[in-house]
């Protein structure tokens, strides 16, 4: 053992020990040589397990020659195919004996190509007018010569839906499967379909017998059609009921309008009309229309039980001016006859009030006064009128 590899005793606490390497370059060169120039050695000198030096006894440790626990012998392998042997968890391997496994082993070992999973609907015949063809890559699609459509969906799967599924989803119909055009993804198939449309002229019910189809499958489209008709009837009834309610509402509005017109006083006929001919024509077209007033696109909107002339739909207007006010229009001083006042009014009514006579300086002829002479007179009038409010001044 190398003495340098022996661990040195621990120094006492509180002391330090310094180790000095004598030949560092020689030891480093030896390490490089041992790695770069390894010496040949026998495998026997290495610490290896015993199974490393022994050949395998059988093929049980190899994937290529694995055997079945039931005693079956492996059959010949096929190039390019998947080898299928009976698994250890198969119930058949537990029930069969050694002799039966040896006889049935090669028959069950077979290879198959990749294909679609098995479907029960593949055994059913296609509906009348349908044809199944394949693309260049082996993908199948279906042609309907009656409706002249092309789809990836199998029409037999739609017919094979259970009846309880139809009851849970009544809106699903036989034609609800989305039909995607083949011309978008497969242009060549669209041209091929045009050539195959000629076959549709020779199709007839005799060429496509339906006796082989089960009765349950044929009743599904009938049930779907019946439910669709019932839904259409319900929608039609709702539309009719809504139309009847609109008509009754319109009649009620017309009756209310007639009642309000009868309650109108007769004096309103003598009032000045405001665009009554044009308004009555438009209103007559609205009220006499048999359609919904909210749907005919008219510019008028009605409001229930409104007596405001600006918002009502009637052909009347409620007066807001007192009736006895208009009869006294002749007594009022308006701007129209203001220019005729000096000739029609009595000259005695133009004299100043009596209280001006008691004021100083007012015993002179007022007609001969100039504007400058009237200024002190106006000041006296202001002082007489503003005795209670002496703090106010005129500007």
From Swiss-Prot:
It is found in: Nucleus; Cytoplasm; Cell membrane; Cell junction, Tight junction. Highly expressed in kidney, heart, placenta and lung. Residues 61-70, 277-293 have a biased composition (Polar residues). One of its GO terms (biological process) is negative regulation of transcription by RNA polymerase II. The keyword Transcription applies. Its main location: nucleus. A motif (PDZ-binding) lies at residues 389-395. It holds the Pfam family WW. One of its GO terms (cellular component) is nucleoplasm. Phosphorylated by LATS2 and STK3/MST2. Phosphorylation by LATS2 results in creation of 14-3-3 binding sites, retention in the cytoplasm, and functional inactivation. Phosphorylation results in the inhibition of transcriptional coactivation through YWHAZ-mediated nuclear export. Keywords: Activator, Cell junction, Cell membrane, Coiled coil, Cytoplasm, Isopeptide bond, Membrane, Nucleus, Phosphoprotein, Tight junction, Transcription, Transcription regulation, Ubl conjugation. Residues 52-116, 277-308 are annotated as: Disordered. Transcriptional coactivator which acts as a downstream regulatory target in the Hippo signaling pathway that plays a pivotal role in organ size control and tumor suppression by restricting proliferation and promoting apoptosis. The core of this pathway is composed of a kinase cascade wherein STK3/MST2 and STK4/MST1, in complex with its regulatory protein SAV1, phosphorylates and activates LATS1/2 in complex with its regulatory protein MOB1, which in turn phosphorylates and inactivates YAP1 oncoprotein and WWTR1/TAZ. WWTR1 enhances PAX8 and NKX2-1/TTF1-dependent gene activation. Binds to SLC9A3R2 via the PDZ motif at the plasma membrane. Binds to YWHAZ in vivo and in vitro through the phosphoserine-binding motif RSHSSP. Interacts (via coiled-coil domain) with SMAD2 (via MH1 domain), SMAD3 and SMAD4. Interacts with MED15. Interacts with PAX8 and NKX2-1. Interacts with TEAD1, TEAD2, TEAD3 and TEAD4. Interacts (via WW domain) with PALS1. Interacts with LATS1. Interacts with YAP1 (when phosphorylated at 'Ser-112'). Interacts (via WW domain) with PRRG4 (via cytoplasmic domain). This is WW domain-containing transcription regulator protein 1. It comes from Mus musculus. The lineage of its organism: Eukaryota, Metazoa, Chordata, Craniata, Vertebrata.
């Amino acid at each position: 053992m190398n003495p340098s590899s022996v661990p040195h005793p621990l120094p006492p606490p509180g002391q330090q020990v310094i180790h000095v390497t004598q030949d560092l370059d020689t030891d480093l060169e030896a390490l490089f040589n041992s790695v770069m120039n390894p010496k040949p050695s026998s495998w026997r000198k290495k610490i290896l397990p015993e199974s490393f030096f022994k050949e395998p006894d059988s093929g049980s440790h190899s994937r290529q020659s694995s055997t079945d626990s039931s005693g079956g012998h492996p059959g010949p392998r096929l190039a390019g195919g998947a080898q299928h042997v009976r698994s250890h968890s198969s119930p058949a391997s537990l029930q069969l004996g050694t002799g039966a496994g040896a006889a049935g082993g090669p028959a069950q070992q077979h290879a198959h190509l990749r294909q679609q999973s098995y479907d029960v609907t593949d055994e059913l015949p296609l509906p009348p007018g349908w044809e199944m063809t394949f693309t260049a890559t082996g993908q199948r699609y279906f042609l309907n010569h009656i409706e002249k459509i092309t789809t990836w969906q199998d029409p037999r799967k739609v017919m094979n839906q259970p009846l309880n599924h139809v009851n849970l989803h009544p809106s699903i119909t036989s034609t609800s499967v989305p039909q995607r055009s083949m011309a978008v993804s497969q242009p060549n198939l669209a041209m091929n379909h045009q050539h195959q449309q000629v076959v549709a002229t020779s199709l007839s019910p005799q060429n496509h017998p339906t006796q082989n189809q089960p009765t349950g499958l044929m009743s599904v489209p009938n049930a779907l059609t019946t439910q669709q008709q019932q839904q259409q009837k319900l929608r039609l009834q709702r539309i009719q009921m809504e139309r009847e309610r609109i008509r009754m509402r319109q009649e009620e509005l017309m009756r209310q309008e007639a009642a309000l017109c009868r309650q109108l006083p007769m004096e309103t006929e003598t009032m000045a009309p405001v665009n009554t001919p044009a308004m009555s024509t438009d209103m007559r077209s609205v009220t006499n229309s048999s359609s919904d007033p909210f749907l005919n696109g008219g510019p008028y909107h009605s409001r229930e039980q409104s007596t405001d002339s600006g918002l009502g739909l009637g052909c009347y207007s409620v007066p807001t001016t007192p009736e006895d006010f208009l009869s006294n229009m002749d007594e009022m001083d308006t701007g129209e006859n203001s220019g005729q006042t000096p000739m029609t009014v009595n000259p005695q009514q133009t004299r100043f009030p009596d209280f001006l006579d008691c004021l100083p300086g007012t015993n002179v002829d007022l007609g001969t006064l100039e504007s400058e002479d009237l200024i002190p007179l106006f000041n006296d009038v202001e002082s007489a009128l503003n005795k209670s409010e002496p703090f106010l001044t005129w500007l």
